[in-house]
Amino acid sequence: MAETPSSPAPAAKAPPALKKGALVRVNRAAYEGSVEAGASDPHPPAYIFEGPGELLVVKGTYGQVRWRRPVPDVWLRMDQLEAFS
């Protein structure tokens, strides 16, 4: 049995890594159905999807976000955050 050489799949470009101080918003598709969404209000506020929030701390796969509103800071998974543009 002859093996055919398999060509490696083209690597998808990873989004730029978010760093402390970055302006972010929540990716609705990644957030809905997550553990974080289940532990929160069933109707998330629009401002988390509209942004911007400031990424205060990154620890492992989670980031702490501060919104420009009088609300508490929140911890969200980094894959649920995207750069605000």
From Swiss-Prot:
Write out the annotated subcellular location: Cellular thylakoid membrane
Per the record, membrane topology reads: Peripheral membrane protein
What InterPro entries does the entry give? NdhO
**Catalytic activity, per the record?**
a plastoquinone + NADH + (n+1) H(+)(in) = a plastoquinol + NAD(+) + n H(+)(out); a plastoquinone + NADPH + (n+1) H(+)(in) = a plastoquinol + NADP(+) + n H(+)(out)
Principal EC category: translocase
Q: How does it assemble?
A: NDH-1 can be composed of about 15 different subunits; different subcomplexes with different compositions have been identified which probably have different functions.
Q: What does this protein do?
A: NDH-1 shuttles electrons from an unknown electron donor, via FMN and iron-sulfur (Fe-S) centers, to quinones in the respiratory and/or the photosynthetic chain. The immediate electron acceptor for the enzyme in this species is believed to be plastoquinone. Couples the redox reaction to proton translocation, and thus conserves the redox energy in a proton gradient. Cyanobacterial NDH-1 also plays a role in inorganic carbon-concentration.
HAMAP family on file: NDH1_NDH1O (MF_01354)
- What family name appears in the similarity comment? Belongs to the complex I NdhO subunit family.
* Protein name as it appears in the record: NAD(P)H-quinone oxidoreductase subunit O
Source organism = Synechococcus sp. (strain WH7803)
